[in-house]
């Protein structure tokens, strides 16, 4: 995790949580019993690739499921992190290192188009996982991680999603 101290991390967590809570109540007032970066009930259990994130209730297309949270890094700090698979580049000078335990969104696995039922949505410097299809309780929540990640981490071991053709970026679509 580089040089970010525990104290700094918890400060970031508190700030992030407060904002997420406000937004959460605005968007979905019935979620007050959920952890504050959760907008919908989710479960973590064995999924497509290791642990996965599952819908704990029916989720409608367009609804926000969960916020992707973590330690906020600037460009310089992000460049020093070479061990995390959970870096999410929000913009040129803001990267979220989502490898922290309290970022439940990190459990959502990748799926190639059109097998995903969610997408990552950047809003005002924050990252939300949003449903792009109606999702039934018990379904695994899957979204396209993007070309760069797929090329680096998924293509070498082979994608496990149910797509007939996997999108391995530069190499183009490759069949199973
Ligand atoms: Zn795939």
Tell me the role of every PLM-derived stretch.
Residues 2-12, 17, 112, 117-176:
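C-terminal SET catalytic tail plus cysteine-rich post-SET Zn-binding segment of SAM-dependent SET-domain
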């Amino acid at each position: 995790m580089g040089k970010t101290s525990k104290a700094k991390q918890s400060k970031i967590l508190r700030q992030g949580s407060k904002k997420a809570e406000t937004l959460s109540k605005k968007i979905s007032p019935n979620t007050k019993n959920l952890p504050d970066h959760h907008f919908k009930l989710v479960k973590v259990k064995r999924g497509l690739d290791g642990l996965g994130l599952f819908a704990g209730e029916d989720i409608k297309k367009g609804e926000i499921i969960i916020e992707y949270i973590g330690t906020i890094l600037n460009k310089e700090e992000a460049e020093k992190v070479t061990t995390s698979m959970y870096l999410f580049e929000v913009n040129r000078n803001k990267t979220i290192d989502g490898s922290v335990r309290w970022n439940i969104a990190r459990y959502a696995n990748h799926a190639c188009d059109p097998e995903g039922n969610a997408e990552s949505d950047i809003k005002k410097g924050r990252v939300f996982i949003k449903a792009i299809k109606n999702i039934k309780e018990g379904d695994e929540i899957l979204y396209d991680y993007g070309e760069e990640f797929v090329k680096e981490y998924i293509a070498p071991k082979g994608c496990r999603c149910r797509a007939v053709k996997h999108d391995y970026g530069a190499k183009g679509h490759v069949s199973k």
